[in-house]
Structures are given as structure tokens and as C-alpha cells.
């Protein structure tokens, strides 16, 4: 049986690390990408004991040539999980252009690379509950209207619909999963919930 190969963008994050661990247990070859400024920030992978089991590649989602290089190098990729983003809402207000270039157009660049190099690749886009913005409904689902309230949320809406468009227009297996806040021991200490729990531990 052929060993499957998966690319995970944003491998150094909470979700990237747990997903890598899960796929490795299923005997996948895992290629993890991260931006140059995150190089060496692999403490989550070390904590899970998988740091040396992953093929690492630097890849800036703002650069077409870097994305194309990865797809040219790894010709037998089966799945791509796009978890990378400029994911801080406050930062997105300070740097809306950079946020859009990475979070919105980065998704488009990956999907275009899949269209150009290998349309058999299955693509997963990590969408965000931030797309809903301020809503009146108690619960949200796929039919809840989007009301993005930040450059980050707007970028995620763009990525969400771009994924849908590539699925319908180019017959690519491209899906989105809408993620709400979720916690774990690998959650970054810069997030509010982690600050609260760390503060409670010190009491």
C-alpha cells in the first residue's frame, strides 16, 4: 500500500503539531511548512516527540515562487492542510495588508498551485468562527450568514469562498472546516485563555 504524503502549512502551531502527530501515527509522510520568521519555533513538535519525524520546508504564503517550489519538489502529495495564517485579530488591524496577503491570498496561491501541478490533491482550509462576527443566533452553522468584523475575519471569508470556488469551478477536492476557539497544553501563551489559566496556576 502506497504511503500517503501530506503537507501541513503552519506546522509549528497548536493544530499543526497535533495534526502532524495524528498523520504520523497513520504512517503518513509529513511535510511541514512555516515562514522563515518561525524557524526553530518547534517546541510543540518536540513536546510531542515528533520533531525529527517531519520534513521541514520554509515557505512564505506571500510568495508564489516558494509555494510552487514545494509542489515541484514533492510531486506525489496526496493532501494539503492549510493551517497557516496571520491569526491575531488585533494584529490584523495594525497590518491589514500583510494579513490579507498571507491569510487570504496565501490560500488562493496554494489552490492555484494545486490546480497547476496536481488536481488530485485533497485540500483542507482552516476557516474561523471569526467569519461570523457579532451574531444574534445562539448557535452557528454552515448556513449562518458571515459578518466579518476585522481584516483577519475578512481574509478568512475570502479563503472560505475561494476554497468553495475551486471545488466547484475546477472539480478539486477542496473543503473548509470552521474552527472555533479550542484549548490544549500546546496553546500559545500569548492567547487570552492561556494567560488566564497560567495566572490561575500561580495563585
Region spans (language model):
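N-terminal Rossmann-like NAD(P)+-binding domain of SDR-like oxidoreductases, especially those catalyzing
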Residues: 1-184
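Glycine/proline-rich active-site loop of Rossmann-fold NAD(P)-dependent oxidoreductases
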Residues: 157, 182-198
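Alpha-helical substrate-binding/gating segment
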Residues: 168, 194-203
